[in-house]
Amino acid sequence: MLEFAISAPLDTGAELLSDQVSANFPWLSLSILFPIVGAFLVPFIPDEGEGKQVRWFALGIALVTFLITVAAYLYGYDPSLSGLQLSERVSWLPDLGLTWAVGADGISMPLILLTSFITALAVLAAWPVTFKPKLFFFLILAMDGGQIAVFAVQDMLLFFLAWELELLPVYLLLAIWGGKKRQYAATKFIIYTAGSSLFILLVALAMGFFGGGTPNFEYTNLAQQSFGTGFQLLCYAGLLIAFGVKLPIVPLHTWLPDAHGEATAPVHMLLAGILLKMGGYALMRFNAQLLPEAHAQFAPLLIVLGVVNIIYAALTSFAQRNLKRKIAYSSISHMGFVLIGIGSFSALGTSGAMLQMISHGLIGASLFFLVGATYDRTHTLQLEEMGGVGQKMRIMFALWTVCALASLALPGMSGFVSELMVFVGFATDEAYTLTFRIVIAGLAAIGVILTPIYLLSMLREIFFGKENDQLVSHTNLVDAEPREVYIISCLLVPIIGIGLYPRLMTDSYTASIQELVKRDDLALQRIKKPSALMIRNTTMTPAVVSSPRLPITQTRSEQLTRK
């Protein structure tokens, strides 16, 4: 039973929050506003040739947005610094504590680049869309700006607004362009995500108004507040539910297979490549960074939930006969490594979680794009209705094989590096007992073993075996076209590049991750040596080494012994 007594504050904010580096040019504001403005210009583009002009316009906006984020990284971001960079701050509604505050550090900058990169490829993947193309590309571009804002804003109320901004485009993309059960999938998505978002708003208001006076919702201010341990635990629990839906964490995951089961290929890429990463990013930014004492006590729970994700989703994926749902559960399984990395008090493990988000964003987008391309040819998602198409689609088979090998963490691919970092980081983390580390690592290894089994068997059922006569006679099994090869090639370049030389990515966020882990480690040390005002009994952290409990009462025999 937890006693929510208020503890003395963890006064580390001033030491660990480095000075902000102001932007020499409003790169981040431009990267947020440019695609949104472009989205509102889409309705004015002449609609001729089944939306051809609209496609080129949307692709141009997405590419320019990507170039803006690249320029921000090259000309305004220093990977060696751990603090906030590219900082922009404009007072908006000072009486309400609302400020337009954006910036980037190692936790957010790689994800900003990933967002703009995946979105540009998703626009190219949407080239065959001819039904209401103006509305489709309007939603894609608006979603681009909203997702970049999620990673760039430095104000918790702005974060909530950006978090909500991307919900409506996803809902409409599912409800209008989805499959037969699109209304069900879209409604389930909006209920899960919008309902859980209420916790973000409540926590933002509670933290912003903490201590009275003029509210302030900026991250740098919140990180230096004297939040008591009980208050942190309540906020942490609420945020864990909200972000756990988006990650997703089992059992808050059921919206994802339904959404993926009905989405089109470009929407698949945005869901798997970006949307899930918002949950992992938010856990790092808010739960781990702003609520360090609560994170130190919830961390073992995150690790257990991560193992549940890995094993449960891998077993469920193995049993799926629908191709989209199989890959969807595979995504849930891989995101379990993110939870384990965030729950570790190791810089290596947390860095591995960050790399796993980036790696899965690339690999997940590639796999789901191939699912869409395969469906366009076979017009079925049931594995038992496929088979024997490898001879007719050799290039497609080669693309599938490489991407599947990347997903099962083949050495030389980014997934291998990220999962290895999480494993080694957690296994060498002395914050947990040796028994706990062995059990968790052993259970997680089961998921690693299951992954190649269900992925390779999936390839066998799609491309090998006897040809389905009905499938061959009623479909046009043409091989991959240049556009499809180009999209997969663009995704494979960073996947293989990071796998061969991980520092291409890890150097961009190592300094920020080290600062984050240092802050959480100080909170952990404080829990190990609690003061009289701290929580007396924390049942959530049985695995933490040397977490002494305060003596509450003494028996008569103990008192006589001491005398």
Swiss-Prot record:
This is NAD(P)H-quinone oxidoreductase chain 4. HAMAP family: NDH1_NuoM. Its EC number is 7.1.1.-. NDH-1 shuttles electrons from NAD(P)H, via FMN and iron-sulfur (Fe-S) centers, to quinones in the respiratory chain. The immediate electron acceptor for the enzyme in this species is believed to be plastoquinone. Couples the redox reaction to proton translocation (for every two electrons transferred, four hydrogen ions are translocated across the cytoplasmic membrane), and thus conserves the redox energy in a proton gradient. It is found in: Cellular thylakoid membrane. Belongs to the complex I subunit 4 family. It is an enzyme of class 7 (translocase). The chain crosses the membrane at residues 25-45, 56-76, 90-110, 111-131, 133-153, 157-177, 189-209, 230-250, 264-284, 298-318, 335-355, 356-376, 397-417, 438-458, 485-505. Signal peptide: none annotated. Pfam families: Proton_antipo_M. It is a multi-pass membrane protein.
